[in-house]
């Protein structure tokens, strides 16, 4: 069994484009595995879909509408037993501009 609480770094990523998000998650996992740390993920989280309906006609024709949607894809990566080498490698990692990253460290 474990000897005590271990620190877990939880990385949550969001993007509108799932291909860019998956590539970023793959880059993070490869970087963490190269530094001999334990990684769980990427775990796909539910996609948030925001739908907007607008009238396509400026005056009449209430039945004529257009629907638009924005999909926000999310992934979760957990890093267990992260060393200083792992954190330094993650800081040097360059990710695309369309990916929003939130990092949280906690003890398990």
UniProtKB/Swiss-Prot annotation:
Involved in the binding of tRNA to the ribosomes. GO terms for cellular component: small ribosomal subunit. Belongs to the universal ribosomal protein uS10 family. One of its GO terms (biological process) is translation. Coiled coil: none annotated. The lineage of its organism: Bacteria, Pseudomonadati, Planctomycetota, Planctomycetia, Pirellulales. Part of the 30S ribosomal subunit. This is Small ribosomal subunit protein uS10. The gene is rpsJ. The keyword Kinase does not apply. Keywords: Ribonucleoprotein, Ribosomal protein. It comes from Rhodopirellula baltica (strain DSM 10527 / NCIMB 13988 / SH1). HAMAP family: Ribosomal_uS10. One of its GO terms (molecular function) is tRNA binding.
